[in-house]
Amino acid sequence: MSSIRSLFADHTVAILCEGSAERIVMEKLLEGGLLPFSADDVITDEWDRPTILRMPAKKFARVYLELAYSQPVIVLRVLDSVHEKFMLPHAFREIPVVSCYTRPEIERLIILHEDWESEWQKVKKRTKPSDFCKERIDSRIKQEDWLRQYWSTEALCAAIRAYSHVHQQASEDEHTLADLLP
């Protein structure tokens, strides 16, 4: 596991999240002071949330990068697909983009937290983590209110660290959420 924490020093951070689950995870970590930056260093979305839902790079640049910030910007993407491209327009190519992957799905953290690993291993080739969790715990696992109540900061950190031990990285350059933790 490599640490990428130092990349965020002296930067304004844009946290782009694939969906609601990723948003809640990142907001919980930010609220708990577990990320290498504070809420004061984050670009907020139009509702003043410290995370931004995923959007095409061109739209993201138009909406957020044409504004003036007190420090250089760094983009932190949290998503499950290592194949998704995110190419900023030419005028913004000097902005660093760091991707943290939660493949195959972020619901994998729930499986680890609930200690369902042995059951999951038996069905993982034919069942998505989200479907596996919906069958066992709650059909609302993608809803923000449910996720906010489900995850404590401590449980979330433990699941993220457990994931880093069972996850097979596709390459040395692949980062996970554990790389952001102290």
Placement of each model-derived feature along the sequence:
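Conserved SAM-binding loop
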Residues: I15
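C-terminal accessory helical subdomains adjacent to catalytic cores in phosphodiester-
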Residues: M1-T12, R23-W47, K58-P182
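Helix N-cap/beta->alpha junction signal
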Residues: E18-G19
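Short, conserved secondary-structure transition motifs
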Residues: D48-R54
